[in-house]
């Protein structure tokens, strides 16, 4: 393999931790050998260089994370998951827990139940662009009732999550998804996750091109070993469509040393990637996908006639962090360069291989690509990617200002049909709303799309169907956007408790009461009902609902306790910062009332709350909050 870095390497950190004491560990590149004793039927694969840290400075062997060992010994994601799935136990062992993530599932327990482990599995689908065929939606709806908890969860990466599946039902559920034009392969795990793109079914050249590019990138980076089909449909590889030839060509191309030519995983090898990897594609100006939060952000560039001609590429975004570890941080992506449209798959592959070869595999807190770029700087990273790309990146093309698009309500597709964006609180589809949505989707044979804001788009609607669909949705409590509080329209929360093992407090179950309390504060301080701020809540610092881009972010840091983050902007182009730690749920008004009072009284015309907090500065805002605590009238 090319691109190895010789000698020792120091893993320092910059950015958010620049002013803080930072631990620096001496790292060195090593070669990870293939499994010494591959399972029957295993193929030998090329080695992947893992950038790791010795356990001690004088250690003779490099210590890799346990997940790296599990991947190495798994025979390309098969073993020991295949054995654990047929055992009588209701759960699977730790090695299998790590591997089943690659197949699109997490093992969970119900944390509301005390004194025993109630095991179940969450399944997550892979839906590039959020596209869901009619057949798949109806299948997921049925599976939720028969094998889940009776609800479907729409996610911030345009997928479904199905909670509460018992181990004994996993194969039935996954095989049903596969046989109904769906997949869960790569929805979790150390590889490329679901690829985002604008969810709206507009018949516009740039939107269609962004969606097609997202689907091609998803296909390029899909695991190839066949383990997924071996485990869930007994080796029958069910394809809904032939792979585009340009995808196959790009995957197989090894002219710049990107591939393991003798491996069933030519891009990933035995070790896959160091950590999760996220890609989004969008049209210029459309930031419905939170483009700067991804490992790779791809933006369609068009000529004066509106014809797509290439792409601007951003790299190094990511939300996850760890409380009290200041060397971990959320980060916005940097501009990498421009590529002609025919080169996009090769450029994407080169970036992925750079992360594969140079991302840290010793400490998973630092394994995301954002830390490599923060450590190296964008110029060094670009030079390394160009070795695998085989070309120089061109200069960024000018882009318009970003705008957030929710795609809610009735809109023209551009082909004579309509689409309707349904606002779904927290993305949780259940009860009468679930029943009504199924009836509409089934009756009118509609395809749907899932948005990155956890909402659902009904696609391809005839004009004559508009009135009966609007009436049916309203009767089920799915109101038109004009009838929903603006706070709710842009708010997001992760599922958190009771099933997520990482949650430190509530998110989904707590956000609606919090939004009502924010609206009450607005009313108290004289902010109009039509006004809003972007609120996002997560139960832990991993950032699944992207709270670090919110104007007002709540990040769980203990039972009924949150960090408060301020400074994101409505178009999701600015990173928020931590404003206050350990704010108890019962005390949030003590922080919000002085902040909103000060915003309402001193903001510039049309100034958003996020822009206001950035202009004012945290020192002044903390002074305002502290004075309010001493005497509200003095603030």
From Swiss-Prot:
Q: What is the effect of changing residue 278 to N?
A: Loss of sulfite reductase activity, basal nitrite reductase activity
* Residues the record lists as binding [4Fe-4S] cluster: 494, 500, 540, 544
Q: Can you list the GO cellular component terms from the UniProt entry? A: chloroplast nucleoid; chloroplast stroma
Please give the annotated consequence of changing residue 276 to Q. Loss of sulfite reductase activity, no nitrite reductase activity
Keyword 4Fe-4S listed: yes
The stretch annotated as transit peptide is 1-50
Listed GO MF terms: 4 iron, 4 sulfur cluster binding; DNA binding; double-stranded DNA binding; heme binding; metal ion binding; sulfite reductase (ferredoxin) activity
- Ranges for region Disordered: 31-50, 245-267
Q: Does the keyword Chloroplast apply?
A: yes
User: What does the record's cofactor remark say about binding?
Assistant: Binds 1 siroheme per subunit. Binds 1 [4Fe-4S] cluster per subunit.
PROSITE patterns assigned:
NIR_SIR
> Can you name this protein?
Sulfite reductase [ferredoxin], chloroplastic
